[in-house]
Amino acid sequence: MSLNSFGHIFRFTTWGESHGPALGAVVDGCPPGLALTEAQIQPFLDARRPGQSRFTTQRQEPDQVRILSGVFEGRTTGTPISLMIENVDQRSKDYGDVAKAYRPGHADYAYDAKYGFRDYRGGGRSSARETAARVAAGAVARLVIPEVSILAWVSEIGGDRIDMDHFDAAEIARNPFFCPDSWAAARWEKLVDDARKSGSSLGAVVECVATGVPAGWGAPLYAKLDAELAHAMMGINAVKGVEIGDGFAAARNTGEGNADPMRPGAGVPEFLANHAGGIAGGISTGQPVTVRVAFKPTSSILTPMPTITREGEATELLTKGRHDPCVGIRGVPVVEAMMALVLADQKLLHRGQCGG
């Protein structure tokens, strides 16, 4: 079984490879009657699109989305929505050496070990190029949850964190790092530039907050909202860790310090803290849902690395091609999309079980 789908009721399947003719997504379970056009999806793809600054890969992809099915006269029909994005700037010749040897840190060896055959061009299915399809699907998911606002940003690159005292949401769209701290963004220019010029790469942390999520979404035990979010975020290329709320910091706290006290509010409780990240017992509390996602440094670097060939012989490999010096930067729209996809699914699940 090949697991290329995600979700329960609001479900999507992605298809395509980095150097194939196109990639895309099929969204199933979307309610009928929602206004949907390609123009509504495009801004989210534009935010993720490569080649927009020297701090991302220089692969030039317009990422123009086409809706092939599931929409009639500008409204969803309730049938599968097929979305397609053409690949137009592949340079497969850059990957000739990768056909014979495994790139350290990439999925090359693991794919060969599992399937006995792999598309080595740009990583094939394991390439972060696949995330364009998720972003398109996430734009559709947002239509299902108009009451929810989702915002993500880069909070750390190469160990250099933002100062939350300088947080300005409006700043996120003003710089190429999706950074809410203009002081940090200025530092990151040199940090990422130095990595790019030396042929190295840097890791990053992306934070995401969803506000407007009502209490009651999610389920206990094996279908927890936080488990669904962790599943979604860990499925993003290059992600190596996920925290909900305070995450690992909770292990260094006390019961008193980690609790989220409440007092009476206007019809709903007023929380005095949000260490839990808006989720308790796997169910949303009505507080903002908060997630942090750790992206590893891009494995494609210009330093020759020891590896082996498909025949098991020792060799060295220098990765060619066009790559992100910090893949976490373009991870921001992807994290937002996965948050939207999970929450749209959870809303429909809750409605089906509880009628809310």
Swiss-Prot record:
It comes from the Bacteria. It catalyses: 5-O-(1-carboxyvinyl)-3-phosphoshikimate = chorismate + phosphate. The keyword Amino-acid biosynthesis applies. InterPro entries: Chorismate_synth, Chorismate_synth_AroC_sf, Chorismate_synthase_CS. Keywords: Amino-acid biosynthesis, Aromatic amino acid biosynthesis, FAD, Flavoprotein, FMN, Lyase, NADP. Reduced FMN (FMNH(2)). The keyword Mitochondrion does not apply. GO terms for molecular function: chorismate synthase activity; FMN binding. GO terms for biological process: amino acid biosynthetic process; aromatic amino acid family biosynthetic process; chorismate biosynthetic process. Its EC number is 4.2.3.5. GO terms for cellular component: cytosol. FMN binds at R125, S126, S127, N237, A238, G281, K296, P297, T298, S299, S300, R322. SUPFAM superfamilies: Chorismate synthase, AroC. PROSITE patterns: CHORISMATE_SYNTHASE_1, CHORISMATE_SYNTHASE_2, CHORISMATE_SYNTHASE_3. Pathway: Metabolic intermediate biosynthesis; chorismate biosynthesis; chorismate from D-erythrose 4-phosphate and phosphoenolpyruvate: step 7/7. It is an enzyme of class 4 (lyase). Belongs to the chorismate synthase family. This is Chorismate synthase. It comes from Novosphingobium aromaticivorans (strain ATCC 700278 / DSM 12444 / CCUG 56034 / CIP 105152 / NBRC 16084 / F199). The gene is aroC.
